[in-house]
Each structure stands twice: as structure tokens, then as C-alpha cells.
Regions:
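Accessory recognition modules or surfaces
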Residues: 76, 128-137
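Acetyl-CoA-dependent GNAT
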Residues: 3-68, 79-81, 85, 89, ...
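Positions that flank functional sites
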Residues: 25, 101, 124
Length: 140
């Protein structure tokens, strides 16, 4: 388990979205899916993608790449892998939230086939709003 690496990526990429205990739960709960990319030489975790399986839907809780490795396609690789795995999980949709002002992330998710389906006011700690995004998988 790469707990400390997950916390480091979370702090550097997501401004400490989760606590250590939340990461422990995310990494150990069998109903949660955690994918990572590890650098072979150093065994260092470079990126993470985690999701919850909720009956026939996946809910992405986190996707982040260490700042020194961003813009190299690692986030796309992680999300593509999760989308592929959704087939064996027989999911119908994948859901996530994104800060409504995060233009690079919104463009990324749109390029991966996600569509805006709603919003949540005051969703984040700083009071900012979130957009709800979904991608149809129709894997049943």
C-alpha cells in the first residue's frame, strides 16, 4: 500500500482534499477501486485514481497526478483504465464532480466523454461550486 505517496499526491495536487484516515479507508475497502501508476526505477507512485462501486455505477472520488509528472498523459491513462475496467464491473455510468472553475479538468473530462448533468453549490471547503459529470458505459 502506498499510503504516504497517496497523501503526498493529494496534498500537492488536490491541496489536501483527504485526511490520512480517509486514504486508509479508500485503499483498504473492497468496494473501492484504487488504481495507480508507479515509476519502475524508484517504485514511487506518480498518479492515482480511486472510485466507489455503487451497484451499477462507478463514482470517481479522486484522480490526481504528482505535479512533476502532470501533462504527460498519466491522468488519461488512469481514467482510460478505469473506464475499461467498468466493463467487467457491469456498470451503466461513471460519475464525478469537478470544481466549476477548473477549466483544464473540465476540458479533460469532456475529451474523455463526460457530460455535465448538474451542479452542487458550495460543494468544496472553500465554498466553491462543483459540476456533476457523467459518462454512459452501458456495460450490462
Amino acid at each position: 500500500m502506498h499510503l504516504n505517496d497517496c497523501i503526498e499526491i493529494d496534498q500537492k495536487s488536490l491541496k489536501g482534499l483527504w485526511t490520512k484516515s480517509q486514504w486508509v479507508r479508500e485503499l483498504t475497502d473492497p468496494k473501492r477501486i484504487c488504481l495507480g501508476i508507479i515509476e519502475l526505477e524508484t517504485k514511487k507512485l506518480l498518479g492515482i485514481c480511486s472510485a466507489w462501486l455503487l451497484i451499477d455505477e462507478l463514482y470517481i472520488t479522486s484522480i490526481a497526478v504528482h505535479p512533476t509528472h502532470q501533462r504527460k498523459g498519466l491522468g488519461k491513462f488512469l481514467l482510460s483504465d478505469l473506464i475499461k475496467r467498468s466493463s467487467s464491473l457491469r456498470t451503466n455510468q461513471i460519475h464525478l464532480e469537478v470544481k466549476d472553475t477548473n477549466e483544464p479538468a473540465k476540458a479533460f473530462y469532456k475529451s474523455m466523454g463526460f457530460k455535465t448533468i448538474g451542479n452542487r453549490s458550495n460543494f468544496y471547503k472553500d465554498g466553491s461550486n462543483a459540476l456533476l459529470l457523467a459518462k454512459e458505459t452501458n456495460n450490462k
